[in-house]
Regions:
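Conserved phosphate-binding/catalytic region of the ribokinase-like
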Residues: 37-43, 68-169
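Ribokinase/PfkB-type carbohydrate-kinase core domain
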Residues: 1-49, 55-104
């Protein structure tokens, strides 16, 4: 695998060790920093792309994310910790992206939301799949937004995960 998607529901020492090994072998570490917790800068420097939601972005940056301006400041602050790519997920509003020194707001698809359970996980998985196929960060975020939009129109977590063929940009 060229990409490793990680989250924080296992001991942080394990996550940090896995990220260190992955970087040693030139793999891209994608981190979903959930559940929200404080993380060391030495660990974050091993992360290629971080995918925080509003709450996690606030914890990492100290900036409450309420709009595009505050998302920009939060992404910038998180990036200053050594992370090149920051994707702050904003639910129905889409995602705010910092890719190296470029910043972009990528809107979500408008859908009628039924159940948001698992939408963040769908976003992270779809993003990682698209990026692993060699697509750009922006295209990967658009694909992830589209997949998450499908997921929120269905009930449940696993049962709401769309097949790749269902996701249309």
């Amino acid at each position: 695998a060229d990409i490793i998607l990680m989250q924080l529901e296992i001991p942080i020492d394990t996550v940090e060790y896995a990220a260190t090994i992955a970087c040693k072998y030139g793999k891209k570490v994608i981190l979903n920093p959930a559940p929200a917790s404080s993380l060391s800068n030495s660990f974050l420097m091993n992360v290629h792309t971080i995918l925080p939601n509003r709450i996690e972005a606030e914890m990492l940056s100290g900036i409450k994310v309420m709009n595009i301006e505050s998302a920009h400041r939060a992404a910038q602050a998180i990036g200053e910790k050594g992370i090149e790519n920051v994707v702050i997920t904003l639910g129905k509003d889409g995602a705010y992206v910092k890719e190296k020194d470029e910043y972009t707001m990528i809107p979500a698809k408008e859908v009628e939301t039924i159940d948001t359970t698992g939408a963040g996980d769908v976003f992270c998985g779809a993003f990682s799949v698209c990026l692993s196929e060699g697509h750009s960060l922006a295209k990967s975020v658009k694909f992830a937004n589209a997949a998450a939009a499908i997921a929120v129109t269905r009930i449940g977590a696993q049962s709401a995960i769309p097949y790749k063929r269902e996701v249309v940009l």
